[in-house]
UniProtKB/Swiss-Prot annotation:
It is found in: Cell inner membrane. Confers resistance to norfloxacin and enoxacin. CDD domains: MFS_MdtH_MDR_like. Keywords: Antibiotic resistance, Cell inner membrane, Cell membrane, Membrane, Transmembrane, Transmembrane helix, Transport. Residues 1-12, 117-138, 186-213, 265-276, 321-339, 389-402 are cytoplasmic. Its main location: membrane. The chain crosses the membrane at residues 13-33, 99-116, 139-159, 165-185, 214-234, 244-264, 277-297, 300-320, 340-360, 368-388. Gene3D superfamilies: MFS general substrate transporter like domains (1.20.1250.20). It is a multi-pass membrane protein. The keyword Repressor does not apply. It comes from Escherichia coli O9:H4 (strain HS). This is Multidrug resistance protein MdtH. Residues 34-98, 160-164, 235-243, 298-299, 361-367 are periplasmic.
Length: 402
């Protein structure tokens, strides 16, 4: 086996262990934020939505800067610094009794993610061969689902005693992850050339096809982020107990572990990436619309199952499509910018979703936020379809002219 192949194989195992630590640290804390501050402390959902949206927007919106800096200086220093910063954010969250302190803790957490997330994504693109990326992203998603359940179960158990224990556990896991990267991650370059920060960012901004695709995905993310805000609140309201939230993540884990990899393997042989992304988005959108009209936990979990199936179909295709469009000369910048759709969609989804949830509750129209999210998903589906049809038309025109 050549040294390059050996490095790739070892890199896969490193990425999987690193991903598990990050997922556990994140899901111990974040799914319980809405339960802690809305249900237990009586805050308005929009206040918590602002905090979650702030974290999302900072982490993903500034990702292009984190990626461009990593292109220049390498992945290791950015990843270690970012993970320690997230640990500090979680420690601060444990003592948050005023909205401003929760917002500050989410700001710290988001800045940490800005530093470590783009270089981690770029390492996947660097180490995994193009023909293997779809399957590897599926493995990461399966791991995400299992880690989400374990993290949510651990966090729910700790929440019975003290929310500070929840946050301390998340902080410790990120400190461990920082130590793991500091000890074992080689000083790898992310790009084929050492790209100056400004040049990497400029290269991305001039790629109009990539920019349009990323911004359109904001609508997709408005739906996806509700697993952190409105769906846990809805499950808690219907069940009457925060402990039911862990079953929501258990459903995701069961579906992901049994269906994600087989669906990815089968669909990559029969369907284009864009068709898989659009099909998953359509299922997610349609499953959102009736959520506000259900009154039983079984009905709600059925819709959540449908939502997760849509995500299982869409997410590996979205990740693979984003990676395939990235320029190898500025991988960090591209993967950082690819998070901008999540920044915009996540911020609007959290803040707008929280506001619509409060509005629907006060107006005795609980279906309002869910119908709006479904409509947004349908419009995003149509916009993606138009983009992909334009790309195919341009390709056919070039082939004919040739």
């Amino acid at each position: 086996m050549s040294r390059v192949s050996q490095a790739r194989n070892l890199g896969k195992y490193f990425l999987l262990i690193d991903n598990m630590l990050v997922v556990l640290g994140f899901f111990v804390v974040f799914p319980l934020i809405s339960i802690r501050f809305v249900d237990q402390m009586g805050w308005a959902a929009v206040m918590v939505g602002i905090a979650l949206g702030l974290r999302q927007f900072i982490q993903q919106g500034l990702g292009i800067f984190g990626g461009a800096i990593a292109d220049r200086f390498g992945a290791k220093p950015m990843i270690v610094t970012g993970m320690l910063m997230r640990a500090a954010g979680f420690a601060t969250m444990g003592i948050a009794h005023e909205p401003w302190l929760l917002w500050f803790s989410c700001l710290l957490s988001g800045l940490g993610g800005t530093l470590f997330d783009p270089p981690r994504s770029a390492l996947v693109v660097k180490l995994i061969r193009p023909q293997q990326r779809g399957r590897f992203f599926s493995l990461l998603m399966m791991q995400d689902s299992a880690g989400a359940v374990i993290g949510a179960l651990l966090g729910s158990w700790l929440l019975q005693y003290d929310f500070r224990l929840v946050c301390a556990t998340g902080a410790v896991l990120f400190v461990l992850c920082a130590a793991f990267n500091a000890w074992l991650l080689p000083a790898w370059k992310l790009s084929t050339v050492r790209t100056p920060v400004r040049e990497g960012m400029t290269r991305v901004m001039r790629d109009k096809r990539f920019v349009t695709y990323v911004l359109t995905l904001a609508g997709y993310y408005m739906l996806a982020v509700q697993v952190m805000l409105m769906l846990p609140i809805m499950v808690n309201d219907v069940a009457g107990a925060p402990s039911a939230v862990k079953w929501m993540y258990a459903i995701e884990a069961c579906l992901s572990l049994t269906l994600l990899y087989p669906i990815a393997r089968w669909s990559e042989k029969h369907f284009r990436l864009e068709h898989r992304l659009m099909a998953g988005l359509l299922i997610m959108s349609l499953s959102m619309m009736p959520v506000g009209m259900v009154s039983g936990l079984q009905q709600l979990f059925n819709l959540i199952c449908l939502f997760y199936i849509g995500s299982i179909i869409a997410e590996p295709a979205r990740e693979t499509l984003s990676a395939s469009l990235a320029d190898a000369r500025a991988r960090g910048s591209y993967m950082g910018f690819s998070r901008l759709g999540l920044a915009i969609g996540g911020a609007i989804g959290y803040i707008g979703g929280g506001w619509l949830f409060d509005l629907g509750k006060s107006a005795h129209q609980p279906e309002l936020p869910w119908m709006m999210l479904g409509i947004i998903g349908i419009f995003t589906f149509l916009a993606l379809g138009w983009q992909f049809s334009q790309k195919r038309a341009a390709r056919r025109l070039l082939e004919r002219d040739a």
